Amino acid sequence: MAKVFHLLFLVFFFSSCKSTTYYLSRHAERAGTMSNDPQLTAEGQKQALDLRDYLRGKNIKGIYSTNFARTKATAQPTSEWYSLPINLYSPNGASSMIDSLKATNKNNILIVGHSNTVDDLVNRLTGANSMTDLPETEYGSLFIVKKKGGNYRFEKIKVPQTTPR
C-alpha cells in the first residue's frame, strides 16, 4: 500500500511540474499597400522562415493565427515544418481562445497576432498588464510565456536571422 501511495505521489508531482510554453509573434513585415489584408514583403517572408528555424526544436503542438494573409503567411512555414494546421481565431475573441488554451494545458503553442493584440495575449496569459501595444515598426520579436505549475514567466527575444538577406 505504501508503494502505491508513493508511486501515485510521484506521478502527481511530476505531472504538476509539466511546463507549457507559448510563443507569441506579431506577423512579419507586411507590404505597405492600401489593402486591408496586405501580404508579407520579401523581408517579411524571410522573417517567417527565421521564426520557423527558431521554433524547429521547440516541439510545437499547436499553431494559432488570425484570419489575415500576413498572420497566416507568418505561421505557414512553422505549420509546414511541424505538419500542423493553422487554427484561426478572431482578434476580438482572443481572450476566450487564451482561456481555452490555458484550460487544455496543451504544450508549446505558437500564436501569431498583430501589434495591437500580442500585448493583450501576453497580458492575458500572465495575468499582469506588463505590455502595451507594439510599435507599428516592430517586427521579428518573439514573446515567450512559460508556465510551470501555476507560475508564468515572460521574456522577449529577437528572433535570430537564419535566412540569407
PLM features: residue spans?
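Active-site-proximal alpha-helix that buttresses catalytic centers in soluble enzyme cores
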Residues: S19-K106, V118-L121, A128-M131, P135-L142, ...
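Sec-dependent signal peptide recognition
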Residues: A2-L8
